Amino acid sequence: MSDLQKDLADKFYNLLHNKQYERLQFEVDMLGSIQNQHSLVKFYYASSIFLKEASKEKELLLASDLFEEVHLSNKNHLQSLYNMIAVSFKTKVFRKVLPLALKAFEKNPDDTKLIEGIARIHFYLGNRKESIQLFRQLYNKLPDKIEGRFPFVSSLNYSSGISQEEYLKECLEFASLVEKKFNIENDNFKFNNKKNDKIKVAFISADFRTHSVSHFFKGLLKRIDKSKFEIILISNLKILEQDDLSRALMRLANGWYDVAEYSDDDLVTFLRSLNLDILFDLSGFTSGNRFEVIARRCAKVQIEWLGYNNTLGIKNLDYLIADKNLINENEFNLYKEKILFLPKIWNVFAPPEILPDIELEEKNNNTIFTFCSFNNYQKISNRTVNVWSQILKHTNSQLLLKTSHAGDIDDLKNNILDKFINNGVSRDQIIFLKREKEIHDHLKLYNKANIALDTFPYPGVTTSFEAIMMGVPVLTMKGFNMNSRCGESINKNIKMDHLIADNDEDYVKKAISFTKEKNNFEIYGKPLREKALSSPLFDAETFVKDFENLLEQVVDKD
């Protein structure tokens, strides 16, 4: 490197260090084509794109290419590879970075940054076995590591062969690290004993927008008795990401606070100042959670519900809301929280005011039997692929796949498709549908299907409610814990126990049998919608009363 190039590199380093990303990009652009610059200049330029929050996908893909060039010019420059991995989590494009990371890992098997990066890539691609194996390797090397642990713990819900005992053990280990970090045992904060005029209830979530959580939550918020309860929404969603549903929720609540920019300490202080009777966490280990806030006592009573259907393992989370289809009484020791049972179902769906028509003609005119699964692609486990493959190979059928997640792109879809093809399924039998932005258009897609196949061990929830609402029955698998039994509870609440499979063999048998039934359209379709809309699945009025009673009992007990 010449003296001039060194001076430029030092200048660009200082700009990067001072977060002057646009200035850095401007200075480099003035030098001419980025392809003609020194590797270090390329590295700083790409880093400025990655670190700038406003960078668009096209820019991020350029940054990835530049990091790749720098790494290939010097295989020992691992920071460029680390950065390329980090960019891939924003673009969800892994086809180039994964082979490079695996090759580097062969030479650097103890590099924890590579281990974590590859584990997370496998997580996004739905390769649960590989992901969990690498995460375990990472935490064996770094047992006290807290940062970045959420994908590992939450991924245990997606993988077959992970028992509830094993899941709880990992939760307790993670929770103990967080509790030790904040010295929970010696937190002497005392709440104000002054009684609130109404029962003061707050819900914290990053999903107060067009999201499954809000579609379930809105019905409760609309109907809960505001003369008894003061309802406050704590939004961990960036203000720029709020939408029409966010604003609708704002209007229904007594108070709304945007806290995405709050530090954990500031948020704990703020929540405690509200003197809440009850704080609901609607996130668990999912994206946008404030786990390290919930781990500290922020309200007199803290409850987990709706957004995450399993234990979190922390001492300061008092209750987990379920129903008796989800958790058996002899399983209470497998959940850190005390279990609160709602009498019928643990949540209820608020359907759109105007539902699309159920059009059976399209199904009748199709000689090929059509299965569908509109679940998040990451729920399609290897076990699910194996079972579905058996069904597809033994029937004249096709499978429609679609996800409501905007972030799921080609690499994940291609990975799923490869798994089916490797199982002997014809490429033509797997059809990926485009994501529909409008809920009405999304629901109409169910008219293309005869029956919905549920994923396992992580079943669909929103998609099952939607399918049934559109007259499409759902074949689900018997589960072993709260999360994996959600499909069971849904089917039991519409008295369709016959569509709960006992095991893999039974699942295949039931699916194949369904393709041979001639009167499916008379049994399901419009009759199923009518049955469902009058069932506990959509009975918001009764659900809210049961929910209110539960809250009053909790406050009285406290």
Model-derived features: where do they sit?
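Short Ser/Thr-rich beta->loop micro-motif in glycosyltransferases that lines
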Residues: 283, 454-460, 478
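Short hydrophobic signal-anchor/transmembrane segments that target glycosyltransferases
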Residues: 71, 220-227, 382-396
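Short alpha-helix at the nucleotide-sugar/activated-sugar donor binding site of glycosyltransferases
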Residues: 468-469, 492
